[in-house]
From Swiss-Prot:
Pfam families: AICARFT_IMPCHas (PF01808), MGS (PF02142)
Protein name: Bifunctional purine biosynthesis protein PurH
Regions crossing the membrane: none
Domain notes: The IMP cyclohydrolase activity resides in the N-terminal region.
This protein's UniProt keywords: Hydrolase, Multifunctional enzyme, Purine biosynthesis, Transferase
Gene Ontology MF terms in the entry: IMP cyclohydrolase activity; phosphoribosylaminoimidazolecarboxamide formyltransferase activity
SMART domains found in the cross-reference section: AICARFT_IMPCHas, MGS
Its EC number(s): 2.1.2.3, 3.5.4.10
Species of origin: Elusimicrobium minutum (strain Pei191)
Family stated for the protein in its record: Belongs to the PurH family.
Domain of life: Bacteria
Pathway(s) the chain acts in: Purine metabolism; IMP biosynthesis via de novo pathway; 5-formamido-1-(5-phospho-D-ribosyl)imidazole-4-carboxamide from 5-amino-1-(5-phospho-D-ribosyl)imidazole-4-carboxamide (10-formyl THF route): step 1/1; Purine metabolism; IMP biosynthesis via de novo pathway; IMP from 5-formamido-1-(5-phospho-D-ribosyl)imidazole-4-carboxamide: step 1/1
Catalytic reactions on record: (6R)-10-formyltetrahydrofolate + 5-amino-1-(5-phospho-beta-D-ribosyl)imidazole-4-carboxamide = 5-formamido-1-(5-phospho-D-ribosyl)imidazole-4-carboxamide + (6S)-5,6,7,8-tetrahydrofolate; IMP + H2O = 5-formamido-1-(5-phospho-D-ribosyl)imidazole-4-carboxamide
Length: 517
């Protein structure tokens, strides 16, 4: 269908008045009669526009402090009747109902109000549940063949332009598109109410869960060029601000989130480098330059083309260090002008800014037609459990290194083993099906590290899960490891403890596993 519909009368009732004055003046200029509810009518009259009060159209006043103002047959009849149905037209004429050709409505700010409230069921939250607005939006969207419905200020300009070019009319295609937006808007609104009230009832994992996603970015492709991809967010905008560089790829985004999540686990100035969604270098220091050097030294071959995250604002000295190596992107809480100028000399580097840790309450992962949902792994220690299970206790330096290793290994793909000093990873074994193979891989990377660096004074291992056999401890001993941190919990824990005692290794059990798949 290509049938145009001329807009003669518009009902406007909005909470968000962004762009409304310009839009309403444009409608008035095109000869559209404006009808409005009390608050919006007051706004439009203050802008010098002639406006009919809705109560004049319905013959019925607003009641119950505005809870009932648009729920009236003269409103919904005017919106819902089919203009090409003789029986409908006769009813409308006989009852003296005046047409409404356009509905402009957005809804009470429920999400914003709930976000500020102490409890989901506070009176102010309840009062910001819109009833009349969604009802009108659904009516107008259902009858899009005859009525135009707008619920987003960003559509005002496009609609006005089309009407100006079409003697005040809108095409079927435009009305159809606006219909979809209206139903999406009401669905999201109802979902927000439902999820907020489930939260208020402490329903952590309810029988049904509604997740609303907003498209924030088109991507060139997915993990591989033959896969189509797009970025959606549970918020309206992408949570990193991009200050410079090429558009982010699917893989860049995965690494950006991974490296940022990891670097936020450290209080000291820290640098984390990711490649293929796992760390290839983690370092801390008194200053960021030291942290970067510690992280980069771990595995510069793998770090080439990776993504770097810093947990402190970028400054000139660290920007100069980063500018000398090839990376895809850098993330930091902030950048001074000098550091930005230095980094921007590399035209393709993506410069990302974010000043808060990841805060999502849940992680979602699709598996076929199903979705796995879990709490994020944000716990470093469970009830401060840090139990030495061996005869030898860790020294102060070893304990510091073990805590660094434990904070680091939780971000490595399982099976994960990491060799560290007190402030730097020096060998990472990731993604092996056998834990002893992860130890051997970390050892291989450590041998490469020693070709360019001195052996650290303290060398420890962190393991994301228990050692199922003593072979992992034996392999660690061959590397010169003096202390190990692991969750414990294997039926063969005693064998691993005995092996550690034989080698004079101190071993800590945390009682907390950090699988990452």
């Amino acid at each position: 269908m290509t049938q145009e519909r001329k807009i003669k009368r518009a009902l406007i009732s909005v909470s968000d008045k962004t762009g409304l004055e310009v839009f309403a003046k444009g409608l008035h200029k095109l000869g559209v009669e404006l009808v409005s509810t009390s608050g919006t009518a007051k706004f439009l009259k203050a802008a010098g526009l002639p406006v009919r009060d809705l109560s004049d159209l319905t013959g019925f006043p607003e009641i119950l402090d505005g809870r009932v103002k648009t729920l009236h047959p003269r409103v919904h009849g005017a919106i819902l009747y089919k203009r090409d149905d003789d029986a409908h037209c006769k009813v409308i004429k006989d009852m003296g109902i005046e047409d409404i050709d356009m509905l402009v409505v957005n809804l009470y700010p429920f999400r914003e109000t709930a976000a500020k409230a102490k409890h989901s069921f506070d009176a102010e939250v309840i009062e910001n549940i819109d009833i009349g607005g969604p009802s009108m939006l659904r009516s107008a969207a259902k009858n899009f063949a005859h009525v135009a419905v707008l619920c987003r200020p960003k559509d005002y300009e496009v609609v006005l332009s089309e009407m100006a070019a079409s003697q005040g009319a809108l095409s079927y295609a435009t009305r159809q598109r606006l219909c979809v937006e209206a139903f999406t808007h009401t669905a999201e609104y109802d979902a927000a109410i439902s999820e907020e009230f489930k939260k208020g009832l402490n329903h952590e994992f309810p029988e049904s869960k509604i997740v609303v996603l907003h498209k924030t970015q088109d991507l060139r492709y997915g993990e591989n060029p033959h896969q189509k991809a797009v970025l959606y967010s549970q918020k309206k905008d992408f949570s990193f601000e991009q200050l410079h560089g090429k558009e982010l790829s699917y893989n860049n985004i995965l690494d950006a989130f991974g490296t940022w999540d990891a670097v936020c686990d450290f209080d000291l100035p820290a640098c984390v480098i990711f490649k293929h969604v796992t760390p290839c270098g983690i370092g801390t220091g008194k200053v960021l330059t030291e942290a970067f050097n510690n992280a980069w030294a771990c595995d510069p071959k793998s770090a080439f083309g990776g993504i770097i995250a810093l947990n402190k604002p970028m400054q000139r000295d660290i920007a100069e260090a980063i500018s000398k190596v090839f990376i895809e992107a850098v993330c930091a809480p902030d950048y001074d002008l000098e550091s930005l100028e230095i980094l921007k000399q590399k035209k393709n580097i993506r410069i990302l800014k974010r000043n808060s840790p990841l805060s999502a309450a849940y992680q979602l992962k699709s598996v076929g037609d199903e979705v796995l949902l879990q709490q994020p792994d944000r716990t470093l220690l469970l009830d401060n459990k840090w139990d030495c299970v061996t005869k030898r206790k860790p020294t102060e330096e070893e304990d510091k290194a073990l805590k660094f290793a434990w904070a680091s290994v939780k971000h490595v793909k399982s099976n994960a083993v990491i060799l560290t000093s007190e402030s730097a990873s020096v060998g990472i074994g990731a993604g092996q099906m056998s834990r002893v193979d992860s130890v051997k891989m970390a050892g291989m990377k450590f041998e490469e590290y020693l070709q360019e660096n001195k052996k650290p004074k303290v060398l420890v291992i962190g393991s994301d899960a228990f050692f199922p056999f003593r072979d992992g401890v034996d392999a660690a001993a061959k590397l010169g490891v003096s202390a190990i941190v692991q969750p414990g919990g294997s039926v063969r824990d005693e064998e691993a403890i005995a092996a550690a005692d034989e080698h004079g290794i101190a071993m800590i059990f945390t009682g907390l596993r950090h699988f990452r798949h």
